[in-house]
Structure formats: C-alpha cells, structure tokens
Design a protein with these regions (language model features):
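Anionic-ligand binding region
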Residues: 1-48
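Glycine-rich, charge-dense phosphate/pyrophosphate-binding loop(s)
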Residues: 38-131
Length: 131
C-alpha cells in the first residue's frame, strides 16, 4: 500500500543532506541486511516487514518530520512494515493481503496523515525462491 504524505520534499535536498551526513564507506559497497535476506528466503512477511529499510529515510524524516507521523500511523493501523520510498514523501506499507491493504488505505485516509493512497500488489509469497 502506498501513501503520499502531506507536503513536498526536494529530492536533490535529501540527497545533498545524505551525502553531507553519510559516514564514509568503501566505494561501491552495498550491504544487504542479513535479516532481509532471511525473511525473503523464509517467505516470512512479518520478518520482512521488520527488516524493511531505506538509507535515505533518516534524512527524509529530519527534513520533513511529518513523514514519521505517516509511517507510525500506518504501523499503528496494522501495517506489518513501513518505510519511505526513495527520498520521500512517498511511504510504502507491507500488508498481509489485498483486503488488508484496502482497509489500511481507508484508515490512513481517515487519519489525515496523507494526501492520497494507492493499492499496489506484487508476487505471491509462494513465488519467492528459498534457494
């Protein structure tokens, strides 16, 4: 489920702040969290929800604090995972089913923490390879 938080956010500004604050790491180093890989291999959507992350999220929230309200509202309303998409202000929520997404979208809309919501779907858990 996707929600656009209230307000606007400049992508170049978020990236500049990220670059300014980023602790040096080896060039080109990409670290995929072990918890994320384990959740994907196991097909465990609850573990996957806990493992969702975005390196830009902290910066985006510091530039636009209302994002944290949108993310927290989604979790409080039953999402099993939440994160900022890209540099924001788009928030994405992991749900258990299409019906769960529909209910969450209606609840978030009613909570007044976003300007619009959309339902998105992906592959079924059974299509995730355990190998």
């Amino acid at each position: 489920m996707i929600a656009l938080a209230e307000g606007e956010l400049s992508t170049p500004h978020v990236y500049r702040e990220f670059d300014r604050l980023q602790v040096a790491r080896p060039s080109g180093a990409l670290e995929i969290p072990t918890e994320l890989l384990q959740a994907l291999r196991a097909g465990d959507c609850v573990q996957l929800g806990s493992a969702l992350s975005n390196d830009l999220e902290g910066v985006a929230v510091s530039v636009m604090p209302v994002l944290s309200k949108t993310l927290q509202a989604g979790l409080d309303l039953g999402a099993i995972g939440a994160m900022i998409s890209g540099s924001g202000p788009t928030c994405v929520f992991l749900t258990r089913s299409h019906d769960h997404s529909v209910n969450l979208a209606a609840s978030l809309s009613g909570a007044g923490v976003c300007r619009s919501v959309r339902i998105a779907s992906g592959p079924a858990v059974t299509s995730i390879s355990n190998g």
